[in-house]
């Protein structure tokens, strides 16, 4: 597993919440620096947070590190940061990182109002950029759904040919 850059990390000497969850879920033996090379305090797009903190995100180093992880593992998940079109480093977007690695995308969507537009735009951008799409999933579906949350999966399924792979419930605590 890898999260190339995580922002909004209270203590950048440790893993942020996302990277820590990835490490735990994968039972990974990789070091914190391998899993999340750039941990940034400011809750901003990675390149913006890095600039605020006077840190330079080395895009080529990230690619090399990702390729080493991919080459040494049978299965690898690389979690993006903020979305496909979020600036990662300099003029490079998360989409550029995905394209360079040639990995299929799993688009993770929130079920709330606005997700149909957000998800379709992401899938459209990925297709336009020639990125392979494994599918999409709705994450953190609440037990008590709003009408928008209740209709999200069906609405998306009628508007895209990409595969809905899962609808995962919101869980609390140690569930």
Predicted regions and their residues:
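Conserved catalytic-core segment of NTP-binding enzymes
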Residues: 75, 80-164
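General beta-strand structural signal in soluble alpha/beta enzymes
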Residues: 1-3, 32-36, 76-80, 107, ...
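Short, surface-exposed amphipathic charged segments that create phosphate/polyanion-binding patches used
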Residues: 50, 150-151, 174-175
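Short, high-confidence coil segments that cap the C-terminus of an alpha-helix
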Residues: 69-74
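Conserved nucleotide-binding/hydrolysis micro-motifs of P-loop NTPases
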Residues: 6-8, 113-114, 142-143, 172-173
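Generic hydrophobic alpha-helical segments
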Residues: 62-66, 119-122, 171-175
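N-terminal phosphate/diphosphate-binding loop that engages ATP/GTP or pyrophosphate donors
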Residues: 1-56, 60, 65-68
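Beta-strand-loop-alpha "switch" segments that mediate conformational coupling across diverse proteins
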Residues: 44, 157-174
């Amino acid at each position: 597993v890898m999260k190339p850059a995580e922002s909004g990390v209270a203590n950048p000497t440790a893993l942020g919440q996302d990277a820590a969850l990835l490490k735990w879920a994968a039972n990974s033996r990789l070091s914190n620096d391998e899993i999340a090379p750039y941990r940034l305090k400011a809750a901003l797009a990675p390149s913006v947070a890095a600039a605020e903190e006077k840190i330079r995100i080395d895009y080529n180093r990230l690619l090399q590190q990702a390729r080493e992880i991919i080459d040494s593992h049978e299965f690898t998940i690389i979690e993006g940061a903020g979305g496909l079109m979020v600036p990662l480093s300099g003029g490079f977007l998360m989409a550029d990182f995905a394209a360079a690695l040639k990995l299929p995308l799993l688009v993770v969507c929130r079920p709330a109002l606005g997700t149909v537009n957000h998800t379709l735009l992401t899938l459209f951008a990925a297709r336009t950029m020639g990125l392979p799409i494994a599918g999409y999933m709705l994450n953190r579906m609440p037990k008590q759904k709003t009408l928008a949350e209740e209709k999200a999966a069906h609405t998306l399924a009628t508007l895209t040919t990409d595969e809905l792979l899962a609808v995962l419930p919101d869980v609390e605590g140690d569930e």
